[in-house]
Amino acid sequence: HHLQDESLTVIQGKIGALVAGQQPTYHGPGETVTFRRGEVHRFWNAGEDILICRGWAKPAYNLEFFLTEIYRSTKANGGKAPSAFDGAYLTSKYKTEFDLIGIPMFVRKVIFPITLLLGRLAGKYSRFEGAPEPVKA
């Protein structure tokens, strides 16, 4: 997140967290991991049990909408990743707020713009009508 601080407290399970340039850390129930705005990071379920966390992001801006749509698309697409059209749309529209570090630069700079154009021509984005406007950095 370019504009938000984020914090997660583990309720159940074990979370793995990685900040770019650092070693991974692992946290269990009652422990908290915090990421500062602009800090490239990722986190994952690092255990065998279900991971349940309580967290916050400040200021929230469009985080809830963005994550809800990414997860909705991922679920509809078989659970591995959002559809190419949804991924291209969401990462392009909200690029001032969020970045998904797992997507190669070539895909973001070349493939996504082509996919976005094809999606617009094919009418793939009608479900995003009324989506909140991105926050300007």
Briefly describe each language-model feature range.
Residues 2-4, 9, 16-137:
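Jelly-roll (double-stranded beta-helix
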